[in-house]
Amino acid sequence: MKHILPILTLTTLAAAASAQSAAAAGLSYNRAGLSYNTDAGAGDNGYSLSVEALVGSSNVWVGASAGLDTKGEDEVTVGYLFKNVVAGIDATAFVGSNDGYGIIARRSLNEVVAGLEGRIVWGQEGGSNDNSFVYELAYNVNSKYQVAVSIADANGVAEETSVTVRYNF
């Protein structure tokens, strides 16, 4: 009985510490975008549409994209968002409808320029050992609009450059 108060105090402190959430990185995950894509290899230039959002107030992330000029270039992805994993980086592990899977790492770069954001995506198609990367630099014009430039790099060959305008909702 004499140890009940210290045990209760330590248990309460441990529960409070584990329930404390990490500071938000200030990144928006509820957004829609229109992209213009230039494909250096195939010459398939065109537009695409993308939407991504968190489900309710959870960390479950869903995304969808579709090529507006081509058939068969659509994908639905589902992932789980880990906020502020290390050094302010948010990481999302995802699986896609085209047997793809990967990790998205995003970070606000406000210490460099206010409104700047970086994103790196690593992915693979199911049954393939080919790595694919997307490198993106984005600028938040205001709380609702973002402009981004990205380069898709599959197997060490920069294949596609995209300019995207996004609306945060």
Model-found features: residue ranges?
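Outer-membrane beta-barrel proteins
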Residues: 2-169
